[in-house]
Design a protein with these regions (language model features):
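Short coil turns that delineate tetratricopeptide repeat
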Residues: 3, 37, 71, 105, ...
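Helix-start (N-cap) detector for alpha-helical repeat units in TPR-like alpha-solenoids
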Residues: 6-7, 40-41, 74-75, 108-109, ...
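Register position in tetratricopeptide repeats
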Residues: 18, 52, 86, 120, ...
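Conserved structural position within tetratricopeptide repeats
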Residues: 30-34, 64-68, 98-102, 135-136, ...
Length: 225
């Protein structure tokens, strides 16, 4: 291998990433960066490796360096925001996702992550707005995940009929999603539709017999029948 060719090191690193060999991949990216320190793609890819290793602070440093060389590097902004979100730095993460949306106003990933940040900050109305904006964009990509967080937000807002509606739409594409079915069962119970809720939780018992939240819900339903 040509040790002085940064592109060869870079592509070797990308291949190693495909096999989840992140430490080896980072060595390749480091070798590439020694030759060309301004390689924004190598910096970004090194950050990706660090994300997989859950080394979020170091990953953010790599993404910042990549952004320094390429201020409109959408994926670097997106993954910096994700690293901040996973580090519970939700307000800083929101700034990154806004940068993504400035570059691409139809980024469903950014809207989804924004909704999750707002939810964790307790701003349910903003979270719901992001979900609805994401769902208004054409295409099914991420729709199940967006509908799930939308259902969680609506549940916290006490809008149980809307939770049921959102969950039903999501379940059309993902009928085996336990979390969605659990949310729907909770919404049915809290909306006073106890028999419908009971039929659904009986199905869920067969899927996850050890879920204590499910047994609490069953007890709640039986108290009201």
């Amino acid at each position: 291998m040509d040790d002085e060719n940064p592109f060869i090191w870079f592509h070797a690193g990308k291949i190693l990433m495909e096999y989840d060999l992140f430490d080896d991949a980072m060595e390749c990216f480091n070798n590439s960066l020694e030759i060309n320190p301004a390689d924004d793609m190598a910096l970004y890819s090194k950050g990706e490796c660090l994300m997989f290793k859950k080394s979020y602070t170091e990953a953010i440093t790599c993404f910042d360096l990549a952004i320094g060389f390429n201020p409109k590097y959408l994926n670097a902004w997106l993954n910096k925001g994700l690293a901040l979100k996973l580090s519970n730095n939700f307000k800083e993460a929101l700034e990154c996702f806004d940068k993504v949306l400035f570059i691409d106003h139809k980024s469903k990933d950014a809207l989804y992550f924004k909704a999750d940040c707002y939810f964790n900050l307790g701003d349910l109305n903003s979270a719901l707005k992001c979900c609805n904006e994401a769902l208004s964009i054409d295409g099914d990509y991420l729709n199940s995940e967006i509908l799930l967080i939308k259902s969680v937000v609506l549940m916290d807002l006490g809008e149980y009929s809307s939770v049921i509606e959102a969950a039903d739409i999501a379940l059309e594409n993902n009928p085996d999603d336990y979390d969605l079915k659990m949310l729907k069962a909770q919404a049915l119970a809290f909306a006073g539709k106890y028999m419908e809720a009971l039929w659904l939780v009986e199905e869920l018992v067969n899927e996850n017999h050890g879920d204590m939240e499910l047994w609490k819900l069953i007890e709640y339903i039986k108290m009201h029948i």
